[in-house]
Amino acid sequence: MLIWLVELSEYFKFLNLFRYITFRTGAALFTSALIVFLFGPTIINSLRIRQGKGQPIRADGPQTHFKKAGTPTMGGLMILAGIVGASLLWADLSNVYVVATLLVTLGFGAIGFYDDYLKVTKQSHMGFSGKARLGIEFVIAGIAVYFMMRTALASGIAGSTFGSSIAFPFFKDFMINIGIMFVVFGGFVIVGAGNAVNLTDGLDGLAIVPVMIAAASFGVIAYLAGNVVFANYLQINFVPGTGELAVVLGAVIGAGLGFLWFNAPPAAIFMGDTGSLALGGTIGTVAVATKHEIVMAIIGGLFVIETLSVIIQVGFFKMTGRRVFLMAPIHHHFEKKGWTESQVVIRFWIVAVGLAMLGLSTLKLR
């Protein structure tokens, strides 16, 4: 919104700052963090009073988790307030990629909120129907992907099929055009990202830091992909307009920092599905917009590992009646093996940093 003040730069030279994505990204980070810091305590106290018993604790989980009983959930509301508030102030709201990303952020956040609401009121882990939840997620993601695809196609950059093509790391010119099926592919990426972060969110601070790492990585990618000079130099696909997504991701990082202040062990609040679905969906949408869907599987490799551990556990148990892991997702397996919660969290953070660096290195390897 504030970018519109650039029109007054003829009279107030300092307003030229608002032209620069880097400045507005930093401002969005600071603003979103400030929003969470200021309103966080009020939101936490309100949720604690309204929820009473807080988020239900799994009976089959590690014994150390029972001391967390009574901790309120839906902390994602704080994160959403920071992201949306800062984005409205600092991002270009006429940018289709920004609007599509915020649509997914709010849409997935609303789904997560309803799921959290059902879990808290029923004091059960059985929230929103799985099929219904996935169906609504796919609709929201599909709408966002469709409009982003149309925008990319209309730009005429890299040919008329660019918007509906899948790009591959290491090869700038190797792309596979799948036509309208790109909406399905992109929807799968976004929904998968949202639910992968959701599965990872099981320990204090475990999900939010890797999310910020991924957001920072994709902030760099979005900025480079949206700049024709850098894109040509690195031989990555130039996608006009995606640089503006760096501002939204700056807001994600700021909101994440603010939330971590309250989520640091012992957590005063959990983000719940409200936050995890929204954050994962946001990262997934940026990956689709910048044509780095496959790279996201590397940068967000920790989330992929967590998801695969659940798929393997469930699939193997259905086939053999036995379990591969002591408990899934895999972070609980290591807890059962004797790792302390802080050991699991910090070691997983280290893995997330390594994977992010590996993912970013693909930008130069062509």
Curated annotation (Swiss-Prot):
Checking InterPro entries in the record gives: Glycosyl_transferase_4, PNAcMuramoyl-5peptid_Trfase, PNAcMuramoyl-5peptid_Trfase_CS
The protein's enzyme class: transferase
What is the name attached to this protein's record?
Phospho-N-acetylmuramoyl-pentapeptide-transferase
A GO molecular function annotation here is: metal ion binding
Q: What is one term from the GO cellular component aspect held by the record?
A: plasma membrane
Tell me the GO BP annotations in alphabetical order.
Answer: cell division; cell wall organization; peptidoglycan biosynthetic process; regulation of cell shape
Q: Which Pfam families match?
A: Glycos_transf_4, MraY_sig1
| Keyword flag Ribosomal protein | no
The pathway noted for it is: Cell wall biogenesis; peptidoglycan biosynthesis
Name its cellular compartments. Answer: Cell inner membrane
Residue stretches spanning the membrane: 27-47, 71-91, 93-113, 138-158, 174-194, 205-225, 245-265, 268-288, 294-314, 343-363
Q: Does the keyword Repeat apply?
A: no
Record EC number: 2.7.8.13
Function, as annotated, reads: Catalyzes the initial step of the lipid cycle reactions in the biosynthesis of the cell wall peptidoglycan: transfers peptidoglycan precursor phospho-MurNAc-pentapeptide from UDP-MurNAc-pentapeptide onto the lipid carrier undecaprenyl phosphate, yielding undecaprenyl-pyrophosphoryl-MurNAc-pentapeptide, known as lipid I.
Question: Cross-referenced PANTHER family, in alphabetical order?
Answer: PHOSPHO-N-ACETYLMURAMOYL-PENTAPEPTIDE-TRANSFERASE (PTHR22926), PHOSPHO-N-ACETYLMURAMOYL-PENTAPEPTIDE-TRANSFERASE HOMOLOG (PTHR22926:SF5)
Which reaction(s) does its UniProt entry say it catalyses?
Answer: UDP-N-acetyl-alpha-D-muramoyl-L-alanyl-gamma-D-glutamyl-meso-2,6-diaminopimeloyl-D-alanyl-D-alanine + di-trans,octa-cis-undecaprenyl phosphate = di-trans,octa-cis-undecaprenyl diphospho-N-acetyl-alpha-D-muramoyl-L-alanyl-D-glutamyl-meso-2,6-diaminopimeloyl-D-alanyl-D-alanine + UMP
Q: Which UniProt keywords apply?
A: Cell cycle, Cell division, Cell inner membrane, Cell membrane, Cell shape, Cell wall biogenesis/degradation, Magnesium, Membrane, Metal-binding, Peptidoglycan synthesis, Transferase, Transmembrane, Transmembrane helix
Q: Name the cofactor(s).
A: Mg(2+)
Which membrane topology describes this protein?
Multi-pass membrane protein
* Stated family: Belongs to the glycosyltransferase 4 family. MraY subfamily.
